Amino acid sequence: MDNKISPEAQVAELELDAVIGFNGHVPTGLKCHPDQEHMIYPLGCTVLIQAINTKEQNFLQGHGNNVSCLAISRSGEYIASGQVTFMGFKADIILWDYKNRELLARLSLHKGKIEALAFSPNDLYLVSLGGPDDGSVVVWSIAKRDAICGSPAAGLNVGNATNVIFSRCRDEMFMTAGNGTIRVWELDLPNRKIWPTECQTGQLKRIVMSIGVDDDDSFFYLGTTTGDILKMNPRTKLLTDVGPAKDKFSLGVSAIRCLKMGGLLVGSGAGLLVFCKSPGYKPIKKIQLQGGITSITLRGEGHQFLVGTEESHIYRVSFTDFKETLIATCHFDAVEDIVFPFGTAELFATCAKKDIRVWHTSSNRELLRITVPNMTCHGIDFMRDGKSIISAWNDGKIRAFAPETGRLMYVINNAHRIGVTAIATTSDCKRVISGGGEGEVRVWQIGCQTQKLEEALKEHKSSVSCIRVKRNNEECVTASTDGTCIIWDLVRLRRNQMILANTLFQCVCYHPEEFQIITSGTDRKIAYWEVFDGTVIRELEGSLSGSINGMDITQEGVHFVTGGNDHLVKVWDYNEGEVTHVGVGHSGNITRIRISPGNQYIVSVSADGAILRWKYPYTS
């Protein structure tokens, strides 16, 4: 039996329907395009272009690692994005053509990380700032797609520069700022040199987080970690004023934008969005948002603007009434699980750190958010009758919520010693089976008002990673990171069969006819096992590079899907054991994957907080 992956030529590509995700940790990562119709933001290694009104998405893919900064030219013709990479390796800057959504050039000089990027006002030059291991500033010619010159970004006795901004009127002047350094640079094109002038702040010592410049270049403003704003004159290189004197912005001024009509939009690390004016910087208008503000981008002249926060929220704010509207949101941490309710593909639930969210499948809208502060949810399942969402938490509790309102229905305290790591429900809605970090599998009897422990099954030596229940509720299979899969008899509550392999099992599935199971894990192999006697039927090479973390099988049992640390979604033919389709789009490790009831979609979730929806390639 041939267990090799068939040649790539025969493998079709999976069609990506939609992406739910936004990396809010990238400073000034959210941008509004000058056409005022699209917003551009990073997610993992991808740059997303999304229509604000129609929500239509395009993807710019080309980075080999996470995108760390983003810039857009004033004309809107070009997008530049920089990435992080491993120590000592070159980090790429990619120049994109916005109109055709294609890669124009790859600019490689910096090492380790690209800290910040800025375009000159007439699209002549791009300036880039290297990360802490690189420490240089480079000016690139956009026409020639080549470096003009470079220089160390900061002096010897100060910290790193982390922010860069171009002058609004002149193509030859830009400013950099960072830890104890503020510099104004002049580009000398005939001699291919850049000349810095250190700005004088007197006794003030500040670490700059954000930078903004007036439309006429008369002043530039620096937001600091101290929570105040420095106003500098680029001609005299002197400090004009500093404020506010009292009530500084909590957790620093993390985003700053100058408005054409005068005044500043300021975002703080504590999520406060403020409109204020120099020299007092007292709040004239303010609103509190969720998560530290990392981006403020104007839509047009600033009558409306978009705000991005660390908790991956994108808000639209109109200047006149200063009220926020949440237009996009997603998980800001690794997504641990995804599940569809029985028999419907209209909605699905995901869980991550702090919360469980229920999404509308076709529109990508968040319908419900259930928050439990400072806890992580490792697994979720819908009861078959749709009356509750059962969830497994790292504080050792099993919590049940109402799916329409998010109301807490009941809690099973101390369900497991080292956190609950996996959970499943029976189709008669009378039992919940949970697995813990210590390796115990526990069967709970769920009544109208009571939750009773029926049995604790102690066989596994390490955490339980996945539980699947047979359709008749008389048997279930649990996979564990101790290298065993155990098939349990749920009537007599004892072990039926044990499967051993030299791997950390991450996922397991029953074939719909329920005489075989398929497993996978860190050894990258997909194994088919006989349920009756636990013998291995066949093994396939599931991935060439990383662990397989998620797996699901269709209701007919003809195809199954896998996803893992190689960031690829693969569709397999069950009988042939061959890959038929591959989906490329994830930037983080895929943690779980599901096929929707009715085989319309495949939904995969990953460690970078992204949820990707793929079109199922076969018609059922």
Curated annotation (Swiss-Prot):
Keywords per UniProt: Cell projection, Cilium, Cytoplasm, Cytoskeleton, Disease variant, Flagellum, Heterotaxy, Repeat, WD repeat
Main location: cytoplasm
GO CC terms of this entry: 9+2 motile cilium; axonemal B tubule inner sheath; axonemal microtubule; axoneme; sperm flagellum; sperm midpiece
Pfam families: WD40
Organism superkingdom: Eukaryota
Matches recorded under Gene3D superfamilies: YVTN repeat-like/Quinoprotein amine dehydrogenase (2.130.10.10)
Expression sites by tissue: Expressed in respiratory cells and sperm (at protein level). Highly expressed in testis. Up-regulated in hepatocellular carcinoma (HCC).
InterPro entries named in the record: WD40/YVTN_repeat-like_dom_sf, WD40_repeat_CS, WD40_repeat_dom_sf, WD40_rpt, WD_repeat_EMAP
UniProt cross-references to SUPFAM superfamilies, sorted A to Z: WD40 repeat-like (SSF50978)
Keyword hit for Translocase: no
WD repeats: 62-106, 109-150, 156-195, 288-327, 330-369, 372-411, 415-454, 459-498, 500-539, 543-582, 585-620
Disease: Heterotaxy, visceral, 10, autosomal, with male infertility: A form of visceral heterotaxy, a complex disorder due to disruption of the normal left-right asymmetry of the thoracoabdominal organs. Visceral heterotaxy or situs ambiguus results in randomization of the placement of visceral organs, including the heart, lungs, liver, spleen, and stomach. The organs are oriented randomly with respect to the left-right axis and with respect to one another. It can be associated with a variety of congenital defects including cardiac malformations.
The family this protein is said to belong to: Belongs to the CFAP52 family.
Subunit note: Microtubule inner protein component of sperm flagellar doublet microtubules. Interacts with BRCA2. Interacts with the CCT chaperonin complex. Interacts with HSP70. Interacts with AK8. Interacts with CFAP45. Interacts with DNAI1. Interacts with IQDC.
PANTHER family to which the protein is assigned, alphabetical: CILIA- AND FLAGELLA-ASSOCIATED PROTEIN 52, WD-40 REPEAT PROTEIN
Remarks, miscellaneous: May be a good candidate as a diagnostic marker for HCC as well as a potential molecular target for development of novel therapeutic drugs.
Function: Microtubule inner protein (MIP) part of the dynein-decorated doublet microtubules (DMTs) in cilia axoneme. Important for proper ciliary and flagellar beating. May act in cooperation with CFAP45 and axonemal dynein subunit DNAH11. May play a role in cell growth and/or survival.
Protein name as annotated: Cilia- and flagella-associated protein 52
Species annotation: Homo sapiens
Origin organism lineage: Eukaryota, Metazoa, Chordata, Craniata, Vertebrata
